[in-house]
Design a protein with these regions (language model features):
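Glycan-recognition and catalytic cores of secretory/periplasmic carbohydrate-active enzymes
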Residues: 1-171
């Protein structure tokens, strides 16, 4: 097997992130989500999409690897776009863990900003409210219970969202 050159891989990732930032409307809270085959521009999503925390999280990881303050500024901007997920009456589903911990979790880890810690704790609280003690799992999609006539639904993704609950319990 060929050796992995981590520095080169991180440089490539950083270049892709910068390219994406150049293409994105930075006065917007739309997040790059996906790109179809043969497409040259990103499909964007709003903050309520289940993937919305990934882009700020990627920016935080890039900042951690490069120390680039411009990347940090963008990471802060896109992270703070997600505050309405925890400060409004937004009805969360299990994806709140992805949305909040990838973004605010990394932001808090790298800055120590107490507002970010509060956002993580509020996100964890919203997720914990979806726990059903009868079933012993977290409800994935509250909106589907009534619509589909399900008494409860839990999908595998919930396992990935437990991290925010464990973190909140320690903090």
């Amino acid at each position: 097997a060929d050796p992995i050159h981590l520095d080169r891989q991180l440089e490539y990732c950083d270049a892709q992130i910068r390219r994406t930032l150049n293409e994105a409307d930075q006065d917007s809270c739309l997040m790059p989500r996906s790109m179809e085959a043969n497409q040259t521009s990103w499909n964007m999503s709003n903050i309520y999409d289940w993937t919305s925390g990934f882009w700020p999280g990627i920016l935080w990881y890039d900042y951690e690897a490069t120390g680039n303050e411009e990347i940090k500024a963008q990471a802060i901007c896109y992270t703070e776009c997600l505050f309405p997920l925890v400060t409004s009456a937004h009805s969360a589903d299990h994806d709140i863990g992805f949305q909040i911990f990838c973004s605010f979790g990394n932001a808090y880890r790298m800055t120590g900003n107490q507002e970010y810690k509060a956002a993580i704790l509020k996100g964890a609280e919203k997720l914990a409210k979806l726990y059903n003690p009868k079933v012993g799992t977290i409800l994935s999609w509250p909106g589907m219970v009534k619509r589909m006539g399900w008494s409860h639904n839990t999908i595998m993704d919930n396992m990935m969202n437990l991290e925010i609950l464990f973190w909140a319990a320690r903090n």
